[in-house]
Amino acid sequence: RDVFMWDGGLPQDPQPPFDYMLTFSIAGLTNEYAEPAVFLRDGRITEVEPMTELETVEFPEPVGTLEAFVTGGGLDTLPWTYEGKLRTLQNLTLRYPGSFVKLRAFYDLGLWSLGPVMVNGVPVVPRDVFHTLFAPKVTFPEGKDMVIIRIKAVGEKDGKPAEAWIELIDYYDDETGFTAMERGTGFSAAIVAEMMWRGETPRGASGVERMVPPGPFLKELEKRNFKVEMRLVEVQGHGGQ
């Protein structure tokens, strides 16, 4: 009935002032930060402003307390696939405490804008300036990262109120030198490519949730040392999050 997701890629050893480590395209990062999210609210497609709805989330040590807030793009085609089937579907991005207020300031200043502004008579794109200044501050070639994913689904099991939880915390691989972000994105793509080659996915193009069988996909993740934890909990009442 209600599905809540949290995820993020973070440095294992955060360095001030930004407590972040760039592990993919900075253009992709600012796209997520600057663009509205698309969620399901009351069963309907709903556009939500980025850099809003700040909350605190607790994880087991050594992760600890993190911030979570709205950014764009995290759900891809899921809202359209599950419109009318779920009441709530949302995804929040995880960052270290104190990150939100800094990022919100960049957003409010317009530093992620793509519209040129005049500086000493010269048109300048604020986002290009931000990329040039910010990227060196969050680039750590020797740094080690982690990827965190948590999903909470609220509904019923055998007619009784229940919650299903899925959690993954993956770390930089010292043996291969792969970052956690590389592991999570690269292995996922490779697994699906193999499944396509074996004829285990339907032909055509659609959202991954329609095309990839979850059971076999999870088994392939386990072969690559991803530790996905799943649990089902009976709860009292019929509340939301």
Description of each model-found segment:
Residues D2-Q241:
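C-terminal catalytic/substrate-binding lobe primarily of soluble NAD(P)-dependent oxidoreductases
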